[in-house]
UniProtKB/Swiss-Prot annotation:
<keyword id="KW-0963">Cytoplasm</keyword>
<dbReference type="Pfam" id="PF00547">
    <property type="entry name" value="Urease_gamma"/>
</dbReference>
<dbReference type="GO" id="GO:0009039">
    <property type="term" value="F:urease activity"/>
</dbReference>
<keyword id="KW-0843">Virulence</keyword>
<comment type="function">
    <text>Expression of the urease operon increases the likelihood of bacterial survival by contributing to acid resistance in vitro and in vivo in BALB/c mice. Y.enterocolitica enters the body via an oral path and must survive the acidic stomach before being able to colonize the intestinal mucosa.</text>
</comment>
<keyword id="KW-0378">Hydrolase</keyword>
<comment type="pathway">
    <text>Nitrogen metabolism; urea degradation; CO(2) and NH(3) from urea (urease route): step 1/1.</text>
</comment>
<dbReference type="InterPro" id="IPR012010">
    <property type="entry name" value="Urease_gamma"/>
</dbReference>
<comment type="subunit">
    <text>Heterotrimer of UreA (gamma), UreB (beta) and UreC (alpha) subunits. Three heterotrimers associate to form the active enzyme.</text>
</comment>
<dbReference type="GO" id="GO:0005737">
    <property type="term" value="C:cytoplasm"/>
</dbReference>
<dbReference type="InterPro" id="IPR036463">
    <property type="entry name" value="Urease_gamma_sf"/>
</dbReference>
<dbReference type="InterPro" id="IPR050069">
    <property type="entry name" value="Urease_subunit"/>
</dbReference>
<dbReference type="InterPro" id="IPR002026">
    <property type="entry name" value="Urease_gamma/gamma-beta_su"/>
</dbReference>
<dbReference type="GO" id="GO:0043419">
    <property type="term" value="P:urea catabolic process"/>
</dbReference>
<comment type="similarity">
    <text>Belongs to the urease gamma subunit family.</text>
</comment>
<protein>
    <recommendedName>
        <fullName>Urease subunit gamma</fullName>
        <ecNumber>3.5.1.5</ecNumber>
    </recommendedName>
</protein>
<dbReference type="GO" id="GO:0016151">
    <property type="term" value="F:nickel cation binding"/>
</dbReference>
């Protein structure tokens, strides 16, 4: 299978977010890469589902709380940017203050 660098990056995001969701379900606090992967995956899937950019940003900013992450992680993530594929093409989605 020949994958482009972008496809490899997407697979890495989805793989890490899968692990992160499982750890979150077990009650573990998430580290920086795990938190970013969940926020990113939520935005990418929302776009794929046909939601608007605004709805994707809102949903991705509510997927995690400070209680879900290790101390200090929320402060390390002022925003998350991801190029997501919507029904009408690719758009850059910026999720501001994604962990509240």
């Amino acid at each position: 299978m020949q994958l482009t660098p972008r496809e490899v990056e997407k697979l890495m995001i989805y793989t890490l977010s899968d692990v992160a969701f499982k750890r979150k379900a077990r009650g573990l606090k998430l580290n920086y890469p795990e938190a970013v992967s969940i926020i990113t995956e939520t935005a990418m899937e929302g776009a794929r589902d046909g939601k608007s950019v605004e709805d994707v940003m809102k949903e991705a900013s509510k997927v995690l709380t400070k209680d879900d992450v290790m101390d200090g992680v929320a402060d390390l993530i002022p925003n998350v940017q991801v190029e997501a594929i919507f029904t009408d093409g690719s758009r850059l989605v910026t999720v501001h203050d994604p962990i509240k």
